[in-house]
């Protein structure tokens, strides 16, 4: 089955500064924004609403991928969590044997329910990446959200 309405938002941060434990990761600047329905009156329902937040405003399934190379000052455990409207959905953990870079990837599919009018808690969905486990001194990251709507 082909995709009738494919949407992508990709953000990149090549200079993440220090982030404390439980802090939100800065997602950076938009490097790619694609909508096959552009100009057809169909809204682009993926947007960056803050330096650390991506907002999903229409029902559907969204593939989320966060990958980063994060620098730690000493041996530690680095954990990043995908947060949706303040609730942790998923997390991944990597260990660092000593000071240096830790590569971490967080893939997850997120569903946004369509009954926004009846239950406004469902929409919009604000996605954030939260640092847990250990503070970082810097790094780079890529955050990508895509969806395909047919019909």
Predicted regions and their residues:
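Extracellular jelly-roll beta-sandwich "head" domains, especially the C-terminal globular C1q domain
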Residues: 1-151
């Amino acid at each position: 089955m082909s995709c009738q309405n494919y949407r992508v938002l990709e953000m990149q941060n090549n200079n993440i500064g220090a982030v404390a434990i439980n802090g939100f990761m800065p997602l950076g600047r938009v490097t790619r924004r694609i909508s096959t329905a552009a100009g057809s009156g169909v809204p682009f329902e993926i947007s960056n609403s803050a330096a650390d937040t991506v907002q999903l405003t229409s029902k559907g399934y969204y593939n989320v991928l966060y990958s980063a190379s994060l620098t730690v000052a000493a041996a530690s455990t680095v954990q990043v969590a995908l947060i949706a409207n303040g609730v942790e959905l998923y997390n991944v953990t990597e260990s660092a044997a000593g000071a240096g870079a830790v590569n971490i990837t967080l893939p997850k599919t997120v569903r946004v329910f369509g009954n926004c009018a009846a239950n406004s808690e469902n929409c919009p969905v604000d996605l954030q990446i939260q640092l847990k486990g250990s503070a970082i001194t810097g790094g780079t990251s890529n955050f990508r959200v895509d969806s395909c709507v047919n019909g």
